[in-house]
Amino acid sequence: MALSMKMRANARVSGRRVAAVAPRVVPFSSASSSVLRSGFALRCLWTSAAWAALASVVEAVKKSVGDLHKADLEGKRVFVRADLNVPLDKATLAITDDTRIRAAVPTLKYLLDNGAKVLLTSHLGRPKGGPEDKYRLTPVVARLSELLGKPVTKVDDCIGPEVEKAVGAMKNGELLLLENCRFYKEEEKNEPEFAKKLAANADLYVNDAFGTAHRAHASTEGVTKFLKPSVAGFLLQKELDYLDGAVSNPKRPFVAIVGGSKVSSKITVIEALMEKCDKIIIGGGMIFTFYKARALKVGSSLVEDDKIELAKKLEEMAKAKGVQLLLPTDVVVADKFDANANTQTVPITAIPDGWMGLDIGPDSVKTFNDALADAKTVVWNGPMGVFEFPQVRQRTVSIANTLAGLTPKGCITIIGGGDSVAAVEQAGVAEKMSHISTGGGASLELLEGKVLPGVAALDEK
């Protein structure tokens, strides 16, 4: 990509992008259009992929909480947006997985150890425009207190006089947990007045909720207009470093593993990864759309008929770019979509009529393991099969074990996506991965090169 840059004197590079779309493509000789960002002018022959890659790199250079020191934090009221959306037992409301709480601890401890008064909020579940007891953050209090080694006080609101009174009574180094911010419909609508109320009792802002960074909500984007500085927490910064680093400057060979049920939900990320990857491994239900595009019989397997031409295009694109696109060579099929269905393993050329594919087979695992053997960077998003069925989740777990073996050999292994994370947890190898992303949708959008509103709104270094 040809690129020329010029900057005004005393101007600094901004991490924000003017628009979420690429400039129009023009011949370089007449490329007079430029994208201005605080005096930073870009002039080039653009492609959508080049634009996405540049946007992703620029966006990631944000001020972090680690750039703030005791003098900046002591006595200050810090509004922290974390992702405490933990799974709860439906009957007891007990936390069944505290991963997201543990992930928030480094940022919170840093702030508390430096004398800040921490106001912490999050969303939990999907409340329907008002308070619901099953979505209160109350279950978080005991576990968070245990992890921090100090008492955690909670109020039953996130704005208003109750919060103001509680904040007024806080001492340095104390934490106040505010209630679920999605109890107000204004949160997801990013209404300025609500954002102003969230910010009313704070002096500065820290966003450590990568899982919602792709949403422009009041607590992730709106509050930054009222609180300065607005910086990234350690978790958010780690996510950006790993995920953006994997795409913008990967150690090679770079392999992406993309699973899931539908081509339509992963098309953008597959296209973006083709610009960077040496190999792409495809798994999950989407493989049957590729098979049908090859004129193979797929039985009753899930197929997106309107995406068959797209599957052909992706295979052609991979060939043109010299990217090795690997599909399973055998599959586990069932006579019905049920956890207790009859199953058998067959080559992809021999799927019986009336049977549907639910997982990849053992030969496929061997093929994929061979492709991964020399990898130096691996990004994995999405399961290899129907992970919720215990009898057909073993291949996904096998891939998790393979990646765990690569990490000690110097390979950077990055896991993003709910079922991929569940697989490494179930295999007991989570600690052996380089990075496990806390945001499924956010990690996908970052890999696609999209601007994350919650990140773009933060202060640049």
From Swiss-Prot:
Residues 1-60 form a transit peptide. Its cofactor is Mg(2+). It comes from the Eukaryota. Pathway: Carbohydrate biosynthesis; Calvin cycle. Its main location: plastid. Keywords: ATP-binding, Calvin cycle, Chloroplast, Kinase, Magnesium, Metal-binding, Nucleotide-binding, Plastid, Transferase, Transit peptide. ADP binds at G260, G284, F387. This is Phosphoglycerate kinase, chloroplastic. Belongs to the phosphoglycerate kinase family.
